[in-house]
């Protein structure tokens, strides 16, 4: 009744070209706690990377085509940095998502606040789940991320330490990345 429709898909469906992001005005990439995980004490190749190279390419193409992207996840920066062996993932973060990693394990209290920025509609104080419960995943180790391009600004900070929790960019496309 609000006039908006929603389509949900897996990142694999984007990677396998089953879903064309260009068909959508906005994309909300919810990563949650997804990050590269070493399996069987390293006997098996790592899995569950938040931004596999094929997804990076699809998101870059979408953004460069004028798409609007919202990304959230506890390891949104640290997974790109820690799984990067060639520098390509860091370039993707800086050139497409317009952020750089400051640190992992950035906060423990679960509160962010908006800060002065060109984005006047992003305002208020917010809490995210930081305690174990049976209803929702817990953000145990959020990332602090900082702007990495002209036109990118910190829009949220962790209330307990003032580290940057969210970065927004508006240029040829719009992207907002949240480290929680």
What does each model-found stretch correspond to?
Residues 1-6, 60, 65, 93-95, ...:
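Carbohydrate-binding surfaces of carbohydrate-active enzymes
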Residues 1-34, 171-173:
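Aromatic-Pro/Gly-enriched surface loop or interdomain linker
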Residues 6-8, 25-31, 63, 68-73, ...:
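Structural recognition of the beta-strand scaffold that forms the well-ordered cores
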Residues 11-18, 53-58, 160-164:
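Alpha-helical scaffolding within the catalytic cores
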Residues 19-23, 62-65, 147-149, 169-171:
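Extracellular/periplasmic catalytic domains that process cell-envelope and extracellular macromolecules
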Residues 35-141, 150-152, 159-160:
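A glycine-rich, often tryptophan-bearing local segment used as a flexible ligand/cofactor-contacting loop or short
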Residues 80, 179-180:
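Segments surrounding the PLD/"HKD" phosphodiesterase catalytic module and close analogs
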Residues 142-144, 153-174:
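Short, surface-exposed beta-strand/loop micro-motifs that present aromatic residues
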């Amino acid at each position: 009744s609000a006039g908006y429709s929603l389509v949900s898909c897996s990142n694999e469906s984007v990677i396998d070209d089953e879903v064309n992001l260009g068909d959508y005005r906005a994309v909300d990439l919810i990563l949650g706690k997804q990050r590269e995980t070493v399996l069987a004490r390293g006997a098996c190749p790592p899995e569950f990377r938040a931004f596999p190279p094929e997804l990076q390419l699809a998101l870059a193409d979408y953004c460069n085509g004028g798409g609007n992207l919202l990304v959230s996840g506890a390891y949104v920066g640290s997974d790109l940095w820690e799984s990067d062996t060639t520098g390509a993932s860091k370039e993707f973060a800086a050139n497409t998502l317009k952020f750089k990693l400051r640190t992992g394990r950035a906060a423990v209290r679960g509160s962010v606040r908006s800060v002065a920025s060109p984005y006047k509609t992003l305002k208020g104080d917010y809490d995210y789940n930081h305690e174990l419960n049976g209803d929702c995943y817990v953000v145990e180790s959020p990332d602090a991320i900082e702007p990495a391009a002209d036109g990118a600004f910190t829009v949220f900070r962790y209330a307990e330490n003032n580290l940057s929790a969210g970065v927004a960019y508006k240029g040829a496309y719009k992207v907002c990345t949240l480290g929680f």
